[in-house]
Amino acid sequence: MKLKLSISTCPNDTFMFDAMLHRRIDTEGLDFDLTMADIEQLNAAALAGEPDITKLSYASFPLVADRYRILGSGSALGRGNGPLLVSRHKLYPDELRDARIAIPGEHTTANRLLSLFFPEASDKRVYLFSDIADAVLSDECDAGVLIHEGRFTYRGKGLRLVADLGEEWEKRTSLPLPLGAIVVSRRLDEQLARTVERVLRRSVEYAFA
């Protein structure tokens, strides 16, 4: 049976889905029609109910909980690896009210954290996550929220840290930050959903072996 699978280009996703996509493991008769996209595109597709299985920002899950359920494998939960708010020029948190801020998507966990900790930051502009650093460097935006590899390379590009949103989450909650989930459509019957769960778990275990 062929299922529509949508994942991001993030190394986390390619790492854990490689085995099932390339049949390095038993997929129990499942085949996959793969789409790779930016996380905000994945969120939008899930909001439209399109994929059978998809990566999704945890911040978006309440919007699709009637159509999708979270699988027990594949979630990105972490400490010390959350989104970073950065700027080119010195910028204090109390100056964010008037700042133009690049974000990786309206429905991303990164944007939800920004809204939670800096509700006064209202001038938000959506960019592809990989273009955010350049938007700040070119002064198209005063600040930007970096995710994925951008959080590890920003200093080398001449950007400076304004706030570590993941660290702030951990300080306030003492919990790991829920970044992304793998969800399965409620269109799939219970038996098929359990098969997907087993295959994904097997793929993750293969990746770590």
Predicted feature locations:
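N-terminal hydrophobic or amphipathic helices and topogenic motifs
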Residues: 1-76, 87, 100, 205-209
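Bilobed "Venus flytrap"/periplasmic-binding protein-like clamshell domains
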Residues: 2-23, 82-142, 149
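General small-molecule cofactor/ligand-binding pocket signal
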Residues: 33-37, 124-127, 162
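A structural signal for short, well-ordered beta-strand segments and their strand-loop junctions
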Residues: 46, 55, 126, 144-146
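Short loop/helix-cap segments at secondary-structure boundaries that form the rim of catalytic
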Residues: 63-65, 114, 153-156
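Active-site regions of enzymes building and remodeling cell-envelope glycoconjugates
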Residues: 68-72, 122-123, 158-162
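Hydrophobic/proline-rich hinge and linker segments of small-molecule sensing/allosteric domains
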Residues: 70-93, 169-187
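Pocket-lining segment of extracytoplasmic ligand-binding domains
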Residues: 128-209
